[in-house]
């Protein structure tokens, strides 16, 4: 189980994700326990994202269950020893599941629409990992890539 990832949305589109999430240890534990319970009750195999809202009483409300790898988890490619993508393939192919270990705290920014043009021209530091999805048609608010910044 990966640690909770904090997401910020803009116009109903994921704009930014980060670890560690700015949550209490109680919310952290409840989020992991609830996600695990959902997975067990569904007898689910593979990567699943459970998205929560936190109310003013610090209760968790399940907003979405995504039975797949999820955009918010793209930072697992660089911030963990094993990504959500590899773990998903391992699970569905019944390969050994590796223990998840965090390498670094991280932030991931989705690159939307024409923003991609500036990113394609940039030079990145060794802590920055740029992913260009190679989409030929640029549309406003379309996810064109992402940038993960490791916080070592």
Positions of PLM-derived features:
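Phosphate-binding core of ATP-grasp and ATP-grasp-like enzymes
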Residues: 1-23, 29-62, 66-74, 89-99, ...
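Short acidic-glycine loop/turn motifs at beta-strand connectors
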Residues: 55-58, 112, 151-152
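C-terminal structural cap/anchor segments
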Residues: 78-85, 91-92
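Short glycine-/aliphatic-rich beta-strand segments at the starts of folded cytosolic domains
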Residues: 102-112
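Hydrophobic structural segments
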Residues: 108-109, 147-150
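Short, conserved charged micro-motifs
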Residues: 116-121, 152
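Expand to "…catalyze enediolate/carbanion chemistry for C-C bond making/breaking, isomerization
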Residues: 123-124, 149
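Short helix/strand-capping connector loops at secondary-structure junctions
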Residues: 139-148
């Amino acid at each position: 189980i990966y640690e909770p990832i904090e997401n910020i949305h803009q116009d109903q589109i994921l704009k930014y994700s980060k670890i560690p999430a700015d949550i209490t240890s109680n919310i952290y534990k409840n989020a992991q326990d609830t996600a695990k319970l959902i997975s067990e009750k569904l007898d689910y195999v593979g990567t699943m994202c459970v998205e929560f809202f936190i109310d003013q009483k610090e209760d968790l409300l399940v907003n979405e269950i995504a039975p797949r790898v999820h955009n918010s988890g793209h930072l697992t490619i660089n911030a963990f020893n094993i990504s959500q993508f590899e773990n998903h393939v391992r699970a569905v192919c019944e390969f050994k599941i590796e223990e998840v270990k965090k390498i670094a705290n991280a932030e991931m920014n989705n690159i939307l629409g024409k923003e991609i043009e500036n990113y394609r021209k940039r030079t990145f530091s060794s802590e920055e990992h740029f992913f260009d999805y190679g989409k030929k048609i640029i549309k406003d608010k379309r996810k064109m890539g992402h940038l993960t910044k490791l916080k070592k």
